[in-house]
Amino acid sequence: MHRYRTHTCGALRDSDIDQTVRLSGWCHRIRDHGGLLFIDLRDHYGLTQCVADPDSPAFKDAEKLRAEWVVRIDGRVRRRPEGTDNDDLPTGKIELFITEIEVLGPAGELPLPVFGEQEYPEDVRLRYRFLDLRREKLHQNIMTRGAIVDAMRARMKQQGFFEFQTPILTASSPEGARDFLVPSRIHPGKFYALPQAPQQYKQLLMMSGFDRYFQIAPCFRDEDPRADRLPGEFYQLDVEMSFVTQDDVFAAMEPVITGVFEDFAKGKRVTKGWPRIPYADSMRKYGTDKPDLRNPIEMQDVSEHFRGSGFKVFARMLEEERNQVWAIPGPGGGSRAFCDRMNSWAQGEGQPGLGYIMWREGGEGAGPLANNIGPERTEAIRAALGLKAGDAAFFVAGDPSKFVKFAGLARTKVGEELNLIDKDQFALAWVVDFPMYEYNEDDKKVDFSHNPFSMPQGGMDALLGQDPLTIKAFQYDITCNGFEIASGGIRNHRPEAMVKAFEIAGYGEQEVVDRFGGMYRAFQYGAPPHGGMAAGVDRIVMLLCGTNNLREISLFPMNQRAEDLLMGAPSQVTPKQLRELHIRLNLPEN
């Protein structure tokens, strides 16, 4: 017999009755039923009920066991007594009558229980992550993550992609966030950087004659903590292709992402034939560039119905050309209580309020706005929005660039409050035609809005002849249920166009050469047209596992203060290590 086990804790069935077997695992739960001891023994594969009565030679040993002790149990498989089957367990028809117990690893008092799914403070869960990972839901999430990554790999290979690994130690580059820097011992005063993404390397692969690349790539960004992003590191499905247009990238990747979602959707519908939404339309209709299309609400510009109207607040705003009035339809929201609740919510978001119109039976509009603009304009708004009796509409006004974020939040709030969001689907879409540049209010300059390596629509002619803020890029995102899950673009593969694109954003040619020397040199020796994307593995797994917390799908995540409480990172290093790196600390006084 094997030293530790003949079967796993999820393997035994009623076909094994009367066999003598050996199991090893953790004591998941121990119950004393009037002298009869039940031990639920758990391993990675499942759970088996083990039982000892006072006649068992192992009864005294069984009495000493405690939760999460690791034990080896020998015994005889028998049918559970009539009426005690557990249909929730694959092993639920049998139990193991214990004949021998060996303690392999006792456990101290537990800082958090493994049995059950009780909520515990996050810091406790992260400090004792090895216990947390034994809990059923988190353990299953990690296994699902592995299966999703396997599915991604398989589907990428079916599409003709080849997997390569790019370097982890690389050069620092301005890709939008701070780099994690690694000092060089051999080259005093110089630093490597951990890659924010394999962007330059994957483009260099295309210039090296490879055609279709992918990898599950670790990425590192020294960013301030955010609720929707783990500090430090994340993983992406990184992709690049040669001799492709934007449509070619879509044709290659849409089946991969759709297929992965269908594999793990657990009965939810998955969009087929994704819509392609221009960035400007997404912002106007949904108030965001990552729309949740499960929410049917689409906002509309209704400025014409308030221009010159009796509602002077909006009418005066509209005298300035840049200002607009947008309507947020609220199907079924035509009650005074709901409209007042939305108004209070808006005030809690720092707004002066949220104007509204309700429609009564017969189509009559009600509320302060309706009273001020009159029945004709009120009816025109109702018709434009496709609303009926019992519905409402909410209004935001001013400069859209200032109110668009709030309008998007209001659309989401209305959808949630009125139960309009279809929770039984994964609504996937492409968002396309992103602006190449944006105006940076902090630095008072034009800057890249997304990836600086994207091809401008119109190429060099656009860079030379257009207002930079009107140039669109061959740049695209994939969105799902309100999350951006992938981003990509067709690359700017001509060196003169690359230099001009960076010049517009305030980078001189020498800085481009210094920062991106390897790629810039490669452009001089025949660079193919190429493009690609990167999909966020963590976010995709989070959506498919049905959680809204990235820590619930990550093995050993940091907390929101970018600390690894289990390993004690970041940590101090010895003076000797600092001397070897020629580093002297200059710590803040406080």
Curated annotation (Swiss-Prot):
Biological processes, Gene Ontology terms: aspartyl-tRNA aminoacylation
Region spans: Aspartate: 199-202
GO molecular function, one term: aspartate-tRNA(Asn) ligase activity
Keywords, ordered alphabetically: Aminoacyl-tRNA synthetase, ATP-binding, Cytoplasm, Ligase, Nucleotide-binding, Protein biosynthesis
EC numbers: 6.1.1.23
GO cellular component terms, A-Z: cytoplasm
InterPro entries referenced in this protein's UniProt entry, alphabetically: Aa-tRNA-synt_II, aa-tRNA-synth_II, aa-tRNA-synth_II/BPL/LPL, Asp-tRNA-ligase_1, Asp-tRNA-ligase_1_N, Asp/Asn-tRNA-synth_IIb, AspRS_core, GAD-like_sf
Top enzyme category: ligase
Site (Important for tRNA non-discrimination): 33, 83
Subunit-structure text: Homodimer.
PANTHER family referenced in this protein's UniProt entry, alphabetically: ASPARTATE--TRNA LIGASE, MITOCHONDRIAL (PTHR22594:SF5), ASPARTYL/LYSYL-TRNA SYNTHETASE (PTHR22594)
Function: Aspartyl-tRNA synthetase with relaxed tRNA specificity since it is able to aspartylate not only its cognate tRNA(Asp) but also tRNA(Asn). Reaction proceeds in two steps: L-aspartate is first activated by ATP to form Asp-AMP and then transferred to the acceptor end of tRNA(Asp/Asn).
Protein name: Aspartate--tRNA(Asp/Asn) ligase
Species this protein is from: Rhodopseudomonas palustris (strain BisB5)
